[in-house]
């Protein structure tokens, strides 16, 4: 549930490498 400081409107989360995932056009970790 922690914002990763990245949006995923046009491209996937680069921060998915550290466990972030796309939710509501923003990348979150848990």
From Swiss-Prot:
It holds the Pfam family Cyclotide. InterPro entries: Cyclotide (IPR005535), Cyclotide_bracelet_CS (IPR012323), Cyclotide_sf (IPR036146). GO terms for biological process: defense response. This is a cyclic peptide. Disulfide bonds join 4-20, 8-22, 13-27. The presence of a 'disulfide through disulfide knot' structurally defines this protein as a knottin. This is Cycloviolacin-O5.
């Amino acid at each position: 549930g922690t914002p990763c400081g990245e949006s995923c409107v046009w491209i996937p989360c680069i921060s998915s490498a550290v466990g972030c995932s796309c939710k509501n056009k923003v990348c979150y970790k848990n």
